[in-house]
Amino acid sequence: MKKTNSLYVSSPVNALVKGILREDKTLKEVLEHGDFGLGTFNDLDGEMVLWDGVFYDLHSDGKTNVADINLETPYACVTHFKPETSVIVDEELTFDTLKKKIDSLFLSKNLIYAIQVTGKFKSIKARSVPKQEAYRPLVDVAGDQKEFFFEEEEGTLVGFWTPDFMHSVTVPDYHLHFISDDKQRGGHLLEFLSSKVEIKIQPIEQLNLDLPHSIEYLTAGLDEDISDDLDKAEH
């Protein structure tokens, strides 16, 4: 029997959207569930990439560093990356045309997909946010985001595609973070233009969701539809 691929989510994304920006889940604990993924750190102090078993902190100035394994996260999505499809695209792609290319590789839009895109990028537009005060809604935090541009980079996009019906659990549609090959630059992907890339995808059929036990989480009102706020914050 084929072993089922699983996505681990450390906390529902709707908690993050509502301003619960701190939890006691360490990166070391998250690493038990995968070697590939993304997320953020407590107080939204940088974007996160987990790639090849190493966590990176993508700061609000576009610079990156290896993250301390004892740091904590309010939201992380990880998997053990075992790609089943690989395609080389030797032509220019934008974010929109990349989405169409990857869409054509999906088995079904009722599954989750881990996505890695590695290669040469003519330009990258990305963002991150500076450290925040607790309990600030994510849509308000988005106003503080810092955008930056990289040119003629070689690097990797790391992330997931998730069905819309899961929007209270994790970020729906495409959610990708960029990190340069030298691990010095990165951020939450907004736009790009590539010249040659290799796309690898992995279908995921199982979800492993942790529900925090913090007072903030247990007493939060999480029944509201957060899809509009999440879309504004992520795009």
Predicted regions and their residues:
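Long, positively charged binding patches that form subdomain-scale interaction surfaces
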Residues: 96-160, 167-169
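A hydrophobic, small-residue-rich beta->alpha segment in the mid-to-C-terminal subdomain
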Residues: 180-222
